[in-house]
Amino acid sequence: MNRFLLAAMTALMLPFTAAADEPVPVEVWVCDYKEGQTLSDLEDWYDDFNKLSDGMDNPNFEAWIWTPFFADLTMGDVLVVTSFPDLESMGQSMMEFFGGDETGALFARYQTIVDCTGRDLWMVQQMRDRD
């Protein structure tokens, strides 16, 4: 239940750049670092992920690393969060990422850094823009 609440609050608080009329899909992975791995390792992975993503046919997504600050620390070490403009774009990006040889190798490296025990998809609707 705590994992559910934290994931829900996290997804609802994502800072989208523009107010959306329709909810957008947000994928939330709940992860623990594998032995000897740290935030720095995950940040290094994201450097390579971003380079590879820039070359994808559909790089239309945003990604965040959420580290607990004032939260249920038993839930996980880190939340890995990705948002997409719509479900079609999400499907295209996921098929491309999980279906390619180079991207598959990158995901295999990701799995050496974190052990993700939860993966949820939320539909998030921004209700207030800070501008």
Regions found by a protein language model. Give the residues of each.
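Non-heme di-metal
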Residues: 104-107
